Structures are given as C-alpha cells and as structure tokens.
Amino acid sequence: MLQQVMTNPGEIIFREVPVPEVKENQVLVKIMNIGICGSDIHVYHGKHPFTKYPVTQGHEVSGEITELGKNVTEFHVGQKVTIEPQVYCGHCYPCRHGKYNLCEELKVMGFQTTGTASEYFAVDASKVTPIPKEMSYEEGAMIEPLAVAVHGVKQMGDVAGLNIAVLGAGPIGNLVAQTAIGMGAAKVMITDISDLRLAKAKECGIDVCVNTKNKDFGEAMIEAFGPDKADVIYDCAGNNITMGQAIKYARKGSTIVLVAVFAGMAEVDLAVANDHELDIKSTMMYRHDDYIDGIRLVNEGKVHLKPLISKTFAFKDYLKAYQYIDDNRETTMKVIINVSEK
C-alpha cells in the first residue's frame, strides 16, 4: 500500500509498505479522506515544536473498516468510521480521572507517532468511532476539528439560553459558533477581518457576522446583545489583539474561553481581567463524548460541514495541497485529501 511521509519540512514522498496486520484488539481501516489543519501546516513549514521528521501525517480522518481483530465484536466490516488520534498512557493523574486529553505523555497521530496518511491503517478499536451511513466521508474527516469545537464550547458548561461572541471565523471559530447555536445558545455573534470567512459563517447559519475592521468589537457586542453584552466570549483567533479585545470588552464577571493556541508568549492586560473578575478558561483537544456530540449535531442538521470544504486533492497531490493553502491563505477554510475512492 502507499504511505505518505514528510521527510523534511516541505518535502513529501510516498513509499510502498505492507498492509498492516491486525492485532486482536484492532481494526483495519481503509482510509478514505484526510483533512489538513493548521497544525499540519506548521509541520509542513518546520514550525511545529513537538514533531520530528520523517513523519507520516493525518489525524483528521474517515474510512471504512475492512478487517476485525479476533477480540473485536462492537464493529463490523464495511462500517463507516472516524479515528480519534490521541495516544495516551492511561496511568497518569489526568488519565486516571478521565481527562486523557491532558495525558502527561500525550502523543497525537501524525505528529509524535505515525498518522493515518496511508491507504490502510490498523488502529485499536477503542479509538474508532462510527459515523452514520448518510454522512459523507468528507464530513467524517471533519469530525475531529468539530470535536475540538464541541469540547471548547463545553468549557462554559450549558450554553443554552446564553449570548455568545466568537472571535475568529476560521474553521474552528465557525464550528464553535455553529456548535453553540446547535446547543441552544440564545444568540451568537462571530467576528473576523475577512469578509469571505464571514460570508461563509452566514452561509452556515450564524446569527450575527461582524467585520471588526469596520466596527469596534465592544460596540458590536452592545448592538448584538444590548448593554449586558455576551455571557461568554470564545477566542478562536489566539493573538494579542483578539485576547486583548476579549478582556477589554467582556462584561464584568463574565467568561472568556481561549480556544486557539497562541504562537508565542501572550501580552495581555491581566490587571483588567483581575479587576473585572473575568473567568478565563482554556481548552485542549477533546474526548470521546465530544466526538459523539459532534456527530449527533451534524446528523441532526445543526452543524454544517460541507460549506467549509474549500478544495480536495488526490492522495499523491498531498504536496500540491499544501502549496495551494500557502497560495490561498485568505480564501481557504478546509482542504481535504482523497486517499481512496469509494
């Protein structure tokens, strides 16, 4: 079978390797689609701090089960699935308390261990989640980023009836906003400086879309929600400007959830956060229940994934996909790799 390998930043080869043998607690998955995310792009540019080369990528994935290990009874051949890419120890304090996304030894497929970018992939059945027959493989490959959004939204607890502001209308911000709406938020406003991303947000059914190049964030919140502003602000851009806006304009005593990852040390006014008694939360990846909730939201028509797909590439055009993203950063939301044809 063919397997993708990034040998060095910006260099991809394909090698012929044997189809993996399935161990007793594993399933063999024919990989159908893989999504490329921001972290993959960091690897492509040699800027991911926790990835060494060579590495086989692929952590946003969908596929079809083709073989079962002898102990696997909960799945069947031909079943559509996605794969949870976390590899955790199971013994550290977070793992023992159900928070394996915070494992002290956490590894992620495609970064610190072999990813799914091959025609077939053997994986522990515990890391496989079924997707509905009606869901496309392209959508299935986007359940992973949706799980990121679901987990992030849940950091506020129950968002039903709340007014919510989302900073950043990229793929994760868009999905956070859609998830909040799907979970019953009263009103959701999303902001960005890209009219294209805001138009995509509008297409996905997000209530209020504001370009903060043209309108002050604080003013936009009052217009959207009234003088009480938002109950929670989700920062899905992750820079000093957006986090600074969140802290400056948040209602006193309200909550800010940092969903995005800062590229460096943050320079924000924590004195204001302290003075306003802001509850600043963070979020890290996801757990299994976030996958289940994400799939349910898509299946119920409350989250729309297909509008986020900007372009698809054949498996052997993996490098061209990265080049396309570099050349079209302002207009690209999600690029999908077609590993196999159904």
Residue ranges and their predicted role:
Residues 20-34, 47-93, 127, 132-134:
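Glycine-rich beta-strand-centered segment in the early N-terminal region that forms part
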